[in-house]
UniProtKB/Swiss-Prot annotation:
GO terms for biological process: endoplasmic reticulum to Golgi vesicle-mediated transport; Golgi organization; intracellular protein transport. One of its GO terms (cellular component) is endoplasmic reticulum membrane. It comes from Aspergillus fumigatus (strain ATCC MYA-4609 / CBS 101355 / FGSC A1100 / Af293) (Neosartorya fumigata). Constituent of COPII-coated endoplasmic reticulum-derived transport vesicles. Required for efficient transport of a subset of secretory proteins to the Golgi. Facilitates retrograde transport from the Golgi to the endoplasmic reticulum. Residues 210-266 are cytoplasmic. The gene is erv25. Residues 39-129 form the GOLD domain. This is Endoplasmic reticulum vesicle protein 25. Coiled coil: none annotated. Residues 1-26 form the signal peptide. The chain crosses the membrane at residues 189-209. Residues 27-188 are lumenal. InterPro entries: Emp24-like, GOLD_dom.
Length: 266
C-alpha cells in the first residue's frame, strides 16, 4: 500500500528541516554570588536586521539575599536591555543594527548570606536568532497558512540566512586577502629598496676608500729585511696626511649613514 503524496511531502520537508535547522540548546551554569562587580558573559554573533530573543531562567526568588542583574550589549557599544533583580523566566528581544557580536552578561550581587555558606543561583540561557526567534504559530494564524506552508516559510528564511552568512564570509575573506596581498607587495618593494640601498652604499664605500687612499698616499718605504726605513723622517708627513684626510673622513659613506640612522631613530 503506497503512501500518500502529502505524507511524502511532510517526510521530505522534515528531513530538509533537520538538515538546515541550526542546533540550539540551552546553556545552563551556576552563578556564584559576590559582593563586587563580577560579570559572566556569553558572546554570540548576529547579522544586521536580525531578530534576537534572549530567554533567561534564574533559580531562586527575589529577596533571598542575592540580586541577579542581566546586561545585553553589542561590540558597537549599544545597550539592548538591563533588567535588574531578575528571578524566574525573563525574555528580552531586540533587532541588530549591524553585523556585530553581542554579549549577554550576568552578575550575582550578594546582599546577605541567609545562613548559606556558598550562595549561588542557576541560570539557564537560551538565545534564538533569526528564523528561530520568530513565533511561527502567530505567523501561521495571522496569514492562515497550512502547516506545510509554515514549514516552507521557515525553511526559506533559514536558507536566506545561510546564503547571507556565506556572502558575509566571502566578503570578509576577500577583504583579508586584499590586505594580505597589499602587505606582501609593500614588504617586497621595501626589501628590494633595502637591498639596492645596501649595494649602492657598498659601491660608494669602495669608491670612496679607493679615492681616500690615493689622496692620503703614506710615504713609508720598507726594506727587504722587514725594518722600516725613513720612519722618523716620514712621521711629520703621516701627521700632515692624517690632518688633511680628517675633512674627507667626515664625508665618509659609513659615517654619513650612521649619523642619518641616529637622527631617524632618535
Amino acid at each position: 500500500m503506497g503512501s500518500s503524496p502529502q505524507s511524502s511531502t511532510r517526510t521530505l520537508l522534515g528531513l530538509l528541516f533537520l538538515l538546515l535547522v541550526q542546533l540550539s540548546s540551552a546553556l545552563k551554569f551556576d552563578l556564584h554570588a559576590s559582593s563586587g562587580h563580577n560579570e559572566r558573559c556569553i558572546r554570540n554573533f548576529v547579522f544586521k536586521d536580525q531578530l534576537v530573543v534572549v530567554t533567561a531562567i534564574v533559580s531562586g526568588q527575589r529577596g533571598d539575599g542575592q540580586v541577579v542583574n542581566m546586561h545585553i550589549k553589542d561590540a558597537l557599544g549599544n545597550d539592548h536591555g538591563r533588567p535588574k533583580d531578575i528571578a524566574g523566566e525573563t525574555r528580552q528581544a531586540f533587532t541588530s543594527v549591524a553585523d556585530t557580536a553581542f554579549d549577554v552578561c550576568f552578575e550575582n550581587k550578594l546582599v546577605s548570606h541567609h545562613g548559606v555558606a556558598n550562595p549561588y543561583k542557576s541560570v539557564e540561557l537560551d538565545v534564538e536568532i533569526g528564523a528561530d526567534a520568530r513565533d511561527w504559530s502567530s505567523v501561521q494564524a495571522a496569514e492562515k497558512l497550512k502547516p506545510v506552508e509554515t514549514d516552507l516559510r521557515r525553511i526559506e528564511e533559514m536558507v536566506a540566512e545561510i546564503v547571507n552568512e556565506m556572502e558575509y564570509l566571502r566578503a570578509r575573506e576577500q577583504k583579508l586577502r586584499d590586505t594580505n596581498e597589499s602587505t606582501n607587495e609593500r614588504v617586497k618593494w621595501f626589501a628590494f629598496g633595502t637591498m639596492g640601498m645596501l649595494v649602492g652604499l657598498g659601491v660608494w664605500q669602495v669608491v670612496y676608500l679607493r679615492a681616500y687612499f690615493r689622496y692620503v698616499d703614506f710615504p713609508v718605504s720598507w726594506r727587504v729585511d722587514g725594518v722600516v726605513a725613513n720612519c722618523c723622517s716620514c712621521c711629520e708627513q703621516v701627521e700632515a696626511s692624517y690632518l688633511r684626510s680628517s675633512r674627507v673622513v667626515f664625508w665618509s659613506p659609513l659615517v654619513m649613514w650612521t649619523r642619518l640612522s641616529w637622527l631617524i631613530l632618535r
